[in-house]
């Protein structure tokens, strides 16, 4: 395991846990997972993943130990989880709920950290973007995007490289009316009018899904009730349906631009040497 950081969502500050005054070694406790289940006479039922606690040993210089403790405690007090990131891509929301010293040295301390891992799985972001296949003078959005658009129209493919369905953030860019896309046979639709420069964002990566309408200045309001949810999960027209593993065919009208941000799932960060 390499390059581990703890980032405070409250203060937007990060502390390296990989040698910059704090060292967790291989972080063995982070490389574990456990399914909850119940046993019946001839079956296993209710298999699921959920929040859990792990223990990690760390050596820290005095100043870094103090900084990590203060940051983690402030996050916990604010009920604002921090973010663990491994190798710059695998993420897990967490709280450091206990920190104890087993040994002290001249300039540092040996720590035991108890970490509450909140997300069901570790996740990494994979972004796919699609635009209309025609334009007269190029795309000129009133705000910048953190990615480049690929020119595709009407159909395409989305790749979820993990082995499990992925939660996602789907964004429709105006102008469009009642925009929808079909990914892997499921239709994602919001019945709203989206003006030029505005966007509608379906987000089902958190504990509760949201659907927001933003104007060109970033001001937003909820349009959750306008998201189509016919048949519920697996019903074929459910706005919060996780994107299947592997390759999924995509279709849409081709008259508006949109993007899908996959949060690919894995039970543990990948081993790297």
Model-identified regions with their sequence ranges:
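Short, acidic/charged, Gly/Pro-enriched secondary-structure junctions
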Residues: 59-100, 249
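Short beta-strand and beta-hairpin "edge-sheet" elements
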Residues: 23-24, 83-127
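A short, compositionally biased
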Residues: 1, 75-81, 173-177, 206-207
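Oligomerization/assembly interface segments of phage tail-like spikes and tubes
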Residues: 33-64, 107-121, 248
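Solvent-exposed loop and beta-edge segments used for protein-protein assembly and interaction
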Residues: 48-50, 76, 105-109, 160-164, ...
